[in-house]
Amino acid sequence: MPVDARTPNEKTVAPLAAASAFVESLRKPTHILVAISGGSDSTGLLLALQEAKAADDDGLRLSAVTVDHALRPESADEARKVAMLCAELGIPHTTRRWDGPKPASGLSEASRLARYRLIADVAREIGADLVVSGHTIGDQRETVAMRAARSGGSDNLGLSGMADAVLYDAHLWIMRPFLACERQVIRDYVSSRSRHWLDDPSNENIRYERVRVRQTLPHSPIALDDSTAVRRQMLSERTAVFLRERAQVFHAALARLADDDVNPDLPEFRHGLAALIAALGGRSYFPAASSMERVLRFLKTGETGRMTVGRVLLDRRRDGLYIFREQRNLPELQIESSGQAVWDDRFLVKNGSDFPINVAAGRVGTAAQAAALFPSAPSGVVKPAMAGLPQIAAAAEGWVSTPEVAITPRLAPFDLFLPRFDLELANAIANLFGRPAYPQPPV
């Protein structure tokens, strides 16, 4: 049963108006891939985009994709019904099935990752420029409520909710034109076009956190505040400027901030430090608020010393703050010829040689090598920083250096999912780590 958990200050938009404004905003020509499950939101999005396209057909193509997660007996039939709808509308459609074993725990997250991967595969195959999904203002309320339950502080960046666009796998923009649309209004729109939608019974299963939150929202409405998202983006942009001007990163393994720039009271410093910790530690998320509070207490003393957080070591010295991967739990892996793998969630290693290679933590080199890699860094910092770099060996021989092996820094906080809020910050980090900039959204 639909619920209305609106608060007085929320602004909502009609589905067709949202789709029309979205289409008008896009750079053209463009090819949109619509992710459609058959539910009311994604069905409404497909219909509204087709109607908007009819009014503005200049260089716009539509295709659709359905992911069959194979978690319910009826899912294959539901995917066929979506394919039939798309055929009636004249929209090319692809179904992809999530095959293979399903995890006993963490099923929701595994399903989400599989869904994005399969959708991205289809986008690549058909040459789509972007993907759109049917997330609504109701989904936004649920997201904010779940994040507020974990940390309700005013500095919780999660309270900004979902971004209207997110970059997937550093190459594909997934956009959400319906984030200001109410589900019931979308359903009314679908019905007015004499179309129907499919109801997924898992949307009523209280085993899932989102369902439980959805059921409580009518009694405890969440007020969405657009200014929260604006503040987050402004903080990210100011932090990007701070890092470009003040931070140094050597070989994607060692960061340095001069002592004058270590200012725990400055929001840009705090946010930038959290981003550097996540990137140098190979973590998908910034450190938890409690961890950052511990770091800031340490830095506010102004004393020299060391502490660890998020798999990195912070070394406060008289000349500044050094940040590098701690020497624990560094992995070893083997990569076959022509294969590739991510090492320590920090480096992508591609083996273009004719033989298997082993990748392990680096050895401490000579003083000359250390000085060349990390100029001006103290010896007590250089040695552990060098040990955090990947080193390559032929599987059947000793350590080797080969031009046929490519090592590229990976940015764990941004490479898989990058909200548009954080694009400028991510590009500042990418520049420091010797990576090209992330692509801009197609608007």
Swiss-Prot record:
Q: Where does ATP bind?
A: 37-42
Alphabetical list of CDD domains matching this protein: TilS_N (cd01992)
GO annotation, biological process: tRNA modification
Keywords from the UniProt entry: ATP-binding, Cytoplasm, Ligase, Nucleotide-binding, tRNA processing
Where does the record place it? Answer: Cytoplasm
What Gene3D superfamilies does the record tag this protein with?
HUPs
Kindly indicate whether the keyword ATP-binding belongs to this entry: yes
InterPro entries on file: Rossmann-like_a/b/a_fold, TilS/TtcA_N, tRNA_Ile_lys_synt, tRNA_Ile_lys_synt_N
Relay the domain remarks.
Answer: The N-terminal region contains the highly conserved SGGXDS motif, predicted to be a P-loop motif involved in ATP binding.
Kindly provide the name given to this protein in its UniProt entry.
tRNA(Ile)-lysidine synthase
